[in-house]
């Protein structure tokens, strides 16, 4: 269950961040820690924002909710996939282990809406709906919407097509094999003992890595834990996507820099096994893979430090497999680029008002 103001939770850190201070369940120790907080820290504790998210939505549930969202868009029967998931979670306590139960609650909501009832009325007395709606919006909010994408006919002629649907992509380009399993939370020991707060996708050196959601580059370069890595922030600033252990020598596209706007489906880098070294461009990771992480941010105080929220994105990665970006190789530059361009209204809106003065 979520915790809001008055209750601070340490959510762990990404691979590049120092180990956070420990927490305790002992009330006496908690009081002692509170007394030792600075005024600024105590002020942060009083803010009203979500401090913990345990994202357990299954691929099945995301698929069911998304397809109904897409298929009913523009009709009176339309319900966003996030509202369907939040409604279900409010009844199940956030559990999506039973596909049958998921269908039961989603079907119930859809039937009520089709009879003319409003979502507002249906959730009025549903205690935790508002929490799950806010939490799931923070996780999934930029993945579905209106966009334009290039398509090609049988003769290869391209044209633009307006769509509503999934506009987020798998982190791995189409046609490139990879294997994965749910490894979130397993132990890591390089530098310090910690839990693995991402999702490893194992493949071949040079596999094109794709931007999952449109956003802007917030971090780029070498880190001793993540090796060559890219950090991309969503335009609403709720999500931070972390792509690590990129290829030695040629980790990412040469034009990228901090502040660059990237679109979902763009090839941003290449799989490798760099990292675990204070020296740049060193391969100290045994297995070639992409470390893909998702950090959720409700308040900027959660971006770095003891209160970071990293979610298990295994189910999300599997859901996004349905939408892989096709890429083609330029033999002269050895770069891979997406084959079909995209126009994202969210990116266009951001670029109209963005302040780039903070970037070199």
What do the predicted segments below correspond to?
Residues 117-228, 264, 320-360:
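Surface-exposed, glycine-biased beta-strand/turn segments
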Residues 174-183, 242-246, 302-320, 338:
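Short amphipathic beta-strand/extended segments with alternating polar/hydrophobic composition
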Residues 200-202, 209-211, 231, 240-244, ...:
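Structural recognition of the beta-strand scaffold that forms the well-ordered cores
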Residues 212-253, 279-287:
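Zn2+-dependent peptidoglycan hydrolase active-site motif and core
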Residues 253-261:
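Short nucleic-acid-contacting surface segments enriched for D/E, G, S/T with interspersed K/R
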């Amino acid at each position: 269950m979520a915790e809001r103001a008055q209750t601070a939770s340490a959510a762990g850190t990404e691979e590049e961040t120092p180990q956070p201070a420990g927490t305790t369940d002992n009330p006496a120790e908690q009081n002692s820690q509170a007394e030792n907080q600075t005024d600024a820290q105590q002020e942060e504790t009083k803010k009203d924002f979500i401090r913990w998210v345990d994202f357990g939505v299954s691929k099945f549930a995301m698929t069911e909710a998304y397809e109904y969202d897409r298929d009913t868009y523009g009709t009176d029967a339309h319900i966003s996939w996030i509202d369907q998931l939040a409604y279900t979670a409010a009844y199940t306590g956030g559990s999506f282990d039973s596909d049958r139960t998921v269908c039961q609650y989603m079907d119930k909501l859809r039937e009520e809406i089709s009879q003319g009832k409003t979502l507002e009325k249906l959730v009025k007395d549903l205690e935790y709906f508002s929490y799950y709606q806010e939490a799931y919006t923070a996780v999934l909010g930029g993945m579905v919407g209106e966009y334009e994408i290039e398509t090609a006919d049988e003769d290869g002629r391209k044209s633009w097509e307006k769509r509503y649907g999934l506009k987020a992509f798998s982190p791995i380009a189409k046609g490139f094999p990879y294997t994965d399993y749910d490894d979130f939370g397993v132990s890591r020991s390089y530098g310090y003992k910690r839990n693995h707060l991402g999702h490893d996708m194992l493949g071949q050196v040079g596999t094109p890595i794709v931007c999952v959601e449109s956003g802007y580059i917030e971090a780029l370069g070498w880190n001793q834990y993540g090796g060559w890595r890219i950090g991309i922030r969503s335009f609403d600033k709720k999500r931070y996507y972390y792509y690590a252990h990129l290829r030695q020598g040629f980790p990412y596209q040469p034009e990228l820099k901090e502040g660059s706007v990237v679109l979902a489906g763009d090839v941003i880098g290449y799989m490798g096994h760099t990292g675990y070294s204070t020296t740049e461009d060193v391969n100290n990771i045994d297995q070639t893979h992409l470390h893909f992480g998702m950090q959720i941010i409700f308040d900027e105080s959660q971006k770095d430090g003891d209160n970071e929220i990293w979610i298990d994105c295994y189910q999300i990665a599997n859901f996004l497999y349905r939408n892989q970006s096709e890429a083609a190789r330029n033999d002269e530059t050895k770069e891979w680029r997406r084959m079909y361009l995209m126009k994202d209204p969210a990116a266009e809106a951001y670029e109209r008002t963005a302040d780039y003065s903070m970037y070199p």
